[in-house]
Amino acid sequence: MNHNYFLQKTIELANESINNGGGPFAAIVVDQNGKIIGIGQNSVTKKSDPTAHAEVEAIRQACQNLNSFQLDNCILYTSCEPCPMCLGAIYWARPAEVYYAATKIDAAAVGFDDAFICPHSPDDNCH
């Protein structure tokens, strides 16, 4: 599977989301055959829904397409390191792998900081 191709796709979708009034995040779920089965773009402000993060949207769509609540043998690609809420959804959906393009430090640098959710010391990988 070409991970760089799918990560680039999430970046393109994130840019599209910005152009359509959404947040700068996107995610896709790919099945074991390399077929995209779920696409999500951040639509928190568009839907007035704080749970409408890209990863959650992509997971919802992929689960509907598979008619399953688990994403065994699937890969989740996302434009940015998932926040704690999305990590919870990822945990329960059980994809085989997760890849992200930007880190949470990158996100914080442009105004999307979730450090208040995880107020630990900076040296324990929870920024």
Segments (PLM) and residue ranges:
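Short, basic/aromatic recognition patches
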Residues: 1-20
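Conserved hydrophobic/aromatic pocket- or pore-lining residues that grip, position, or stack substrates
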Residues: 10, 26, 58
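Short beta-strand scaffold segments in enzyme catalytic cores
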Residues: 25-31
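Short, glycine-anchored, charge-dense loop/turn motifs used at functional sites
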Residues: 33-37
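Zn2+-dependent cytidine deaminase-like catalytic core
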Residues: 38-127
